[in-house]
């Protein structure tokens, strides 16, 4: 897995808003003069529909190395730009929102957004390495979920044979175990112990999470955004991602994102590293489970 501009992680954040404020000075002025002064109306925030239109405008601007999500509660779009995005490209994004009520917040991320190829443990094909996300059952048969940008590489893997893959747009894939007895429903924590996974769920902003991957082991952090769109440049665009501040590096792609015994996501990509930190994106696992009719072991 190699970091590109916003790209997936295989080998397995948005922006300034101006507020119109009626200060106490207005009230003071009203008291000091005989005539009443009407307080200015508060600026209305963007609606869900307007936010969706603004998100589509950013998508059409097609700036590689950017990722963004909307906040209906604030009327904002939060956009994260990796180190490859120039000021001119950020201006292109801003211009795309000209006339929109959506407020843009821009954050910077170190390094490139890229997919990382290099249950957390390593799976390999040819010269590429990714990480296993979660072992699952499909009609009673043991399979493994990982990142789609990993399963796109080859049909034959160290643990079995690919039976499905979806990337770009999504980032999930599934491999049928050649040795079903080896399929463990737990996630390896890289300290000699394992975490039982008993269910799958949906992440929420602020949630404390952990990620397991074959390059950097077990790492912790929190969810910073949901339903993020990530432009990985030539690798493609993915939608509906979970955004976090958990670090990851090439080879962690496809690895497990979880909270306690709940499976949450599959490592897609990001920027930075585990020395200086980073921004990462994850395919929601519930979508992958639904696509393949699978359940966690």
Swiss-Prot record:
Family named by the database record: Belongs to the peptidase S1 family.
Protein name (record): Streptogrisin-A
Task performed by this protein: Has a primary specificity for large aliphatic or aromatic amino acids.
GO molecular-function terms, A-Z: serine-type endopeptidase activity
SUPFAM superfamilies, sorted: Trypsin-like serine proteases (SSF50494)
Keywords assigned: Disulfide bond, Hydrolase, Protease, Serine protease, Signal, Zymogen
Subunit structure: Monomer.
Active site (record annotation): 149 (charge relay system), 171 (charge relay system), 253 (charge relay system)
One Gene Ontology cellular component: extracellular region
Enzyme Commission number(s): 3.4.21.80
Pfam families the UniProt entry points to: Pro_Al_protease (PF02983), Trypsin (PF00089)
Name of the coding gene: sprA
Catalytic activity: Hydrolysis of proteins with specificity similar to chymotrypsin
Domain of life: Bacteria
Organism: Streptomyces griseus
Signal peptide interval: 1-38
């Amino acid at each position: 897995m190699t970091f590109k501009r916003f790209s997936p992680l295989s080998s397995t954040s948005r922006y300034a808003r101006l507020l119109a404020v009626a200060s106490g000075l207005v009230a003071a002025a009203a008291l000091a003069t005989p005539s009443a002064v009407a307080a200015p109306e508060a600026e209305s925030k963007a609606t869900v529909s307007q936010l969706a239109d603004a998100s589509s405008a950013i998508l059409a601007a097609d700036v590689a190395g950017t990722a963004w999500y909307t906040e209906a509660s604030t009327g904002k779009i939060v956009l994260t730009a990796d180190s490859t995005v120039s000021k001119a490209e950020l201006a292109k994004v801003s211009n795309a929102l000209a006339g929109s009520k959506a407020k843009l917040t821009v954050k910077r991320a170190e390094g490139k957004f890229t997919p990382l190829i290099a249950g957390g443990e390593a799976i390999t094909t040819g010269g590429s390495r990714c990480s296993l996300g979660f072992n699952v059952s499909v009609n009673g048969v043991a399979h493994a979920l990982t990142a789609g940008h990993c399963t796109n590489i080859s049909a034959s893997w160290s643990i079995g044979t690919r039976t499905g893959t979806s990337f770009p747009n999504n980032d999930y894939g599934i491999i049928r175990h050649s040795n079903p007895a080896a399929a463990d429903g737990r996630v390896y924590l890289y300290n000699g112990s394992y975490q039982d996974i008993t269910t799958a769920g949906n992440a929420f902003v602020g949630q404390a999470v952990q990620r397991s991957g074959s390059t950097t082991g077990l790492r912790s952090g929190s969810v910073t955004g949901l339903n993020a769109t990530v432009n990985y440049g030539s690798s493609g665009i993915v939608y509906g991602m979970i955004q976090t501040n958990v670090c990851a590096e090439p080879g962690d792609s496809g690895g497990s994102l979880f909270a306690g015994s709940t499976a949450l996501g599959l490592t897609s990509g990001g920027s930075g590293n585990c020395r200086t930190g980073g921004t990462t994106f994850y395919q929601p696992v519930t979508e992958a489970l639904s696509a393949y009719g699978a359940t966690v072991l």
